[in-house]
Design a protein with these regions (language model features):
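Short, glycine-/aromatic-enriched active-site segment of Class I SAM-dependent methyltransferases
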Residues: 207-242
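A short glycine-rich, Lys/Arg-flanked "PGG" loop and its adjoining helix->strand segment in the class I
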Residues: 189-204
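Conserved N-terminal segment of class I S-adenosyl-L-methionine
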Residues: 1-179, 189-192, 253-257, 269-314, ...
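Alpha-helical linker/edge segments of TPR/alpha-solenoid repeat scaffolds
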Residues: 379-391
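A SAM-dependent methyltransferase catalytic signature shared across enzymes that methylate proteins
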Residues: 15-22, 234-251
């Protein structure tokens, strides 16, 4: 039976540059839902269009969203996902909040008395964990009434509602943190402008989002989701923050994408948002073709790993893998995936296939360090000099 999805949609411009053309990098999302992701031809932002309207998405969150995503759960100590109702779920949830608190404490400097606001604070547990280290003044914004009340019971001054409706009067915050919310927001630039207005001039903003340069699981069947309206990269999220009047001080490209920023002092007569220009991109060479090519390779490698796990090795699979390695890839994922294939092939005594894989990486359009790493690996496996010397 088809899953219920938001039924009212709209064509969306690129949230960073306002463009409307690009390369399609996905046609579906998790649970088989129709989700069309476009990589913008101008700035390489990956975003959904057409997308659900804000009203339709709001109704979806209030109705069937939890039916679809409520069972996703959190990682246990063994790295396996524990869903709601399973043994160990509460411990996994605590571990998740602890990780968020650790990230905040590691990436920003907090002091006793600091006014800290978390947007999408849920039950307030991350803020409470931070309070165990520093005597912060904890504030939250949470649209869910039940979770907002839990946050208040935990001692967090929590506003029930959306960011755009939050009005703190004259109060300004020393730190604002936003964990895995921005990707859900219809108008991210407006939201960041709002957050800038809530910060002290010396305040910090910490944003965490899924990282499109480091996806997880199958690309269309898992990473892309109907509720993730934008898939940010280390190139595009900092540029969006710069448009909103922030100076980006740290970018952590490690699994999730973390960005730390502070309000930028504006020149006389300057207004926000700043106009888009390619100078906002720290890596302008990472254009739509660059991103789309690597997402294609990522998707292929993930599907081949799944086939290998379910059906085992075959000449056809090795041939498909070697062909895929002739295209650009995200280096970390490429190294991890190929290490898996080589290890599994060697365990089955399939030395020739393992050599094909190592040499394909060594001879492919990949970073020099990675190519040399696999060239050395091929040498240890006994590749003939003429094959190694082709690198």
């Amino acid at each position: 039976m088809a899953l219920e999805v938001p039924d009212a949609t709209e064509n969306a411009p690129c949230p960073l540059c306002g463009g409307s053309t690009g390369l399609v990098v996905g046609e579906k999302g998790r649970f088989g839902m129709p989700v069309r992701n476009l990589c913008c031809a101008t700035c390489a932002t990956v975003y959904i269009t057409p997308r659900p309207t804000a009203a339709a998405m709001g109704e979806y969150y209030r109705s069937t969203y939890r039916k679809h995503y409520g069972g996703v759960g959190y990682l246990g100590a063994d790295g396996k996902t524990i869903a709601v109702g399973q043994d160990g779920y509460e411990q996994a949830l605590v571990r998740w909040h602890q990780q968020q608190a650790n990230n905040a404490l590691t990436l920003v400097t907090l002091t006793d008395g600091a006014k800290v606001l978390e947007v999408g604070c849920r039950s307030g547990q991350t803020l409470k964990l931070i309070q165990e280290r520093y005597a912060i003044q904890a504030f939250g914004i949470e649209p869910g009434e039940d979770e907002a009340e839990q946050a208040r019971q935990a001692g967090v001054a929590c506003f029930t509602g959306a960011l755009e409706d939050f009005e703190p009067g004259e109060r300004r915050f020393d730190h604002v943190q936003w964990f895995h919310v921005l990707e859900h927001v219809h108008e991210p630039l407006a939201a960041l402008l709002k957050l800038r207005s809530l910060l002290e001039p010396s305040g910090t903003l910490l944003v965490e989002v899924p990282n499109v340069y480091q996806p997880y699981g199958l690309l269309e069947e898992n990473f892309f989701q109907n509720v993730h309206l934008v898939s940010y990269s280390p190139n595009t999220l900092p540029a969006l923050l710069r448009r909103a009047g922030f100076d980006v001080t740290r970018v952590i490209d490690d699994g999730s994408l973390f960005v730390v920023a502070t309000p930028r002092a504006l020149a006389a007569g300057a207004s926000l948002p700043a106009p888009y220009g390619r100078e906002l991109l720290s890596m302008p060479e990472q254009d739509a073709d660059w991103v789309a090519a690597r997402l294609r390779t990522y998707a292929t490698l993930e599907k081949l790993q799944l086939l290998f796990k379910h059906r085992g090795p075959s000449p056809e699979l090795t041939s498909a893998l070697v062909s895929a390695l002739d295209f650009p890839a995200f280096p970390g994922h490429l190294a991890e995936a190929c290490a898996f294939f080589v290890e599994q092939l060697l365990a089955r005594g399939m030395l020739d296939d393992a050599l094909q894989v190592t040499l394909a990486v060594a001879q492919g359009p990949h970073p020099l360090e990675l190519r040399h790493q696999f060239r050395n690996f091929a040498e240890r496996l006994g590749a003939p000099p003429e094959a190694r010397d082709a690198v």
